[in-house]
């Protein structure tokens, strides 16, 4: 019995010693892994190329990152780099994995990134009715990233039905007069006062195939676009800037969301041209990209193939580049399903 007790005591001591050695070994390995991140000073700028990039406060690939960065397409200054990390120039110590950073050409627009949305559904009065969870733009559109050359080729035969006649339509003394068959629609600018909110109306052009004037309204901290029927003077609300398909059956609108940020997209079906009637099929706030929809050098248009061609960018790249039209951008082709 005495021998058994001594044996068990020795066995317990050996196990404890082994566990301590194992823990010490793991600690040495962990310390060694951390020590592998040796940083070298650098001065360069790189883009965040991955939409799901995570931010680290400790440069250790074996630790959990602190949080998601949410700066897809942002151009960041780098002050140091190691084998796995870039140290971002900032008042705080934070690091990004090297595979999440790169050149502008490296920005990753997969089909999932192109189709992802914040919200998708349709408005019913003042209420936004959501689609079921997980629905993306792929339910209504096929969206493909295309080359600059493909965009330019389609542009040569692009469909541009919006025509602006600034000789016939002029604003006089703050009143925009729109001659229609049955009436003259007058839109009067209102200066902002303690009693009145700001209202400014601008003539954007005429969409001849559907006999509609396009008007932009600017208000205090808001704006909209709407049609005025050239025959009846009837007003039709739309989400933002409209693009009519070559067959006249659909309208796609693109513009900034109500909260700013990435692009809002809406699809309308033209139910009737006389009297004019449209139906909202779907409206969505795109998550990761924004269209250069107001750009003269990079216009949005329908091609003869019935697809919408759009110059676009990751949100943070757009904010950096939108005033400089010589900057590169990305291009997508949107096909209605």
What would you call each of these model-derived segments?
Residues 174-193, 220-237, 266-285, 323-337:
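Surface-exposed loop/turn elements that mediate protein-protein interactions on large endomembrane-trafficking
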Residues 215-220, 253-259, 264, 310-316:
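Beta-strand C-termini and the immediately following turn/loop, strongest in propeller blades
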Residues 204-209, 241-253, 299-308:
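Blade-terminus and WD-like Trp-Asp/Gly-His loop motifs, strongest in beta-propeller folds
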Residues 25-85, 120-123, 180-186, 190:
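Beta-loop motif signature
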Residues 1-28:
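Bacterial Sec-dependent N-terminal signal peptides
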Residues 23-41, 89-136:
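Boundary regions of SH3-family modules and the immediately adjacent low-complexity/disordered segments
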Residues 108-217:
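Terminal domain-start segments
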Residues 280-297:
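Conserved blade-ending motifs and adjacent loop-strand segments that build the rim/top face
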């Amino acid at each position: 019995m005495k021998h058994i007790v001594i044996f068990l005591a020795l066995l317990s001591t050996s196990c404890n010693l082994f566990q301590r050695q194992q823990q010490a070994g793991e600690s040495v390995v962990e310390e060694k892994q951390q020590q592998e991140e040796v940083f070298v000073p650098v001065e360069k700028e790189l883009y965040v190329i991955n939409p799901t990039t995570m931010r680290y406060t400790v440069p250790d690939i074996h630790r959990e990152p602190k949080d998601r960065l949410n700066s897809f397409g942002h151009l960041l200054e780098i002050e140091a780099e190691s084998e796995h990390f870039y140290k971002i120039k900032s008042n705080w110590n934070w690091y990004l994995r090297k595979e999440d950073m790169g050149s502008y050409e490296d920005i990753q627009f997969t089909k999932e990134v192109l189709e992802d949305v914040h919200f998708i559904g349709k408005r019913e009065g003042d209420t936004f009715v959501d689609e079921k969870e997980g629905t993306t733009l792929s339910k209504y559109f096929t969206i493909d990233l295309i080359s600059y050359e493909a965009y330019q080729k389609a542009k040569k035969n692009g469909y541009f039905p919006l025509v602006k006649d600034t000789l016939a339509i002029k604003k006089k003394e703050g009143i925009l007069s729109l001659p229609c068959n049955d009436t003259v629609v007058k839109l009067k600018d209102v200066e902002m006062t303690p009693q009145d909110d700001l209202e400014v109306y601008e003539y954007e052009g005429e969409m001849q195939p559907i006999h509609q004037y396009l008007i932009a309204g600017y208000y205090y901290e808001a704006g909209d676009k709407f049609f005025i029927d050239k025959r009846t003077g009837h007003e039709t609300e739309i989400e933002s800037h409209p693009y009519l398909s070559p067959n006249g059956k659909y309208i796609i609108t693109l513009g900034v969301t109500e909260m700013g940020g990435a692009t809002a997209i809406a699809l309308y079906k033209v139910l009737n041209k006389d009297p004019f009637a449209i139906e909202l099929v779907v409206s969505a706030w795109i998550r990761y990209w924004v269209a250069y929809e107001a750009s003269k050098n990079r216009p949005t248009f329908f091609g003869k193939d019935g697809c919408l061609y759009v110059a676009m960018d990751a949100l943070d790249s757009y904010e950096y580049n939108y005033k400089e039209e010589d900057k590169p951008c990305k291009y997508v082709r949107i096909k209605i399903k």
